[in-house]
Amino acid sequence: MIKNPKVLILTAHYGNGHVQVAKTLEQTFRQKGIEDVIVCDLFGESHPFITDITKYLYLKSYTIGKELYRLFYYGVEKIYDKKIASWYANFGRKRLKTLLQVEKPDIVINTFPIIAVPELKKQTGISIPVYNVLTDFCVHKIWIHREVDRYFVATDHVKELMVDIGVPAEQIVETGIPIRSSFELKVNPDIIYNKYQLCKNKKILLIVAGAHGVLGNVKELCQSFMSVPNLQVVVVCGKNEALKQDLLSLQNQNSDALKVFGYVENIDELFRVTSCMITKPGGITLSEAAALQVPVILYKPVPGQENENAMYFEKKGAAVVIRDDSEVFAKTEALLQDDVKLLQMKEAMKSIYLPEPAGHIVDAILAENHAEPRHIPIKSPALAQSFT
């Protein structure tokens, strides 16, 4: 048995999702009495200049670089086994070796497709368990390596995709994607309506605009939706201060129809009272929506994992996918007027959601390494037994 194991969680700042999952896992380990947990942006620390450039290109994929990103995502998938793997496997290796030598972790977890650790295992024979926590409702080959001990995935659909490309089924566990604990709490909605000055007798449309211009024509959309009777529009601008200031002028014209916010710390509160939400199809956002059964309208998915996520939720009946700006208003208004469809989408979200994903992942990892949590017993004996 490993007493007080040290856990190293590797992540990357491409969007907020991977880091958020890493932090959620870190908090869950600490809640279970495992205090020695390190979160590291391996690529950012190893090659900050290259990382800044690639992050910039990633953000540009939302606006001017969609075709470029399509070629990258699907092109890498095709040639990955031949050329990319060797280069990518060694990216961040120097920093990684220093981390392993100095910190001496007992467990390594990846919330971003970093294969430097399993590749190092393969080349040097070091013995350290490696776990990959996939953060989308699809899989890219870049996540896969023979030296990864276990994969934690969102759904049985992802598991099937992985089995199809040769990953042994016993190495894959369906747990859901880790989300912030606030999304799994019981909250009195009356408190939320009062806090945000929302009306219980009206439908609420939540628009998550984001900080990087990923949702276009927000002001025009708000103007259109403000004319819809018995509807309140709530816009979360994130850290996009320019957008917030632009929309506040609209809010001043009709503060009952439009509510504008910047960064919202407890955004789960708005999820709980919204009738439906317009957003981008990131894996973490969709997992949070599933946890609270929020019907989603997915705005112009970027080719790659966003598009794969969107297609999955659309096929399950949990989402409406918008691929052209001209469709947003008409399709959203139609959905808001269709209570039967909204209820069906909520039920579809409920069928996708797996409760307490972070807890199940942490319990399973600790059980497999014979490092049971201090103070708190394992929540899922059945899951833990599958690792022994």
UniProtKB/Swiss-Prot annotation:
Annotated compartments: Cell membrane
Pfam families xrefs: Glyco_tran_28_C, MGDG_synth
CC terms in the record's Gene Ontology section: plasma membrane
First-listed, main subcellular location of the protein, grouped into a coarse class: membrane
Source superkingdom: Bacteria
Listed EC numbers: 2.4.1.315
Coiled coil region boundaries: none
Catalytic activity: a 1,2-diacyl-3-O-(beta-D-glucopyranosyl)-sn-glycerol + UDP-alpha-D-glucose = a 1,2-diacyl-3-O-(beta-D-Glc-(1->6)-beta-D-Glc)-sn-glycerol + UDP + H(+); a 1,2-diacyl-3-O-(beta-D-Glc-(1->6)-beta-D-Glc)-sn-glycerol + UDP-alpha-D-glucose = a 1,2-diacyl-3-O-(beta-D-Glc-(1->6)-beta-D-Glc-(1->6)-beta-D-Glc)-sn-glycerol + UDP + H(+); a 1,2-diacyl-sn-glycerol + UDP-alpha-D-glucose = a 1,2-diacyl-3-O-(beta-D-glucopyranosyl)-sn-glycerol + UDP + H(+)
This protein's UniProt keywords: Carbohydrate metabolism, Cell membrane, Glycosyltransferase, Lipid biosynthesis, Lipid metabolism, Membrane, Transferase
Protein name: Processive diacylglycerol beta-glucosyltransferase
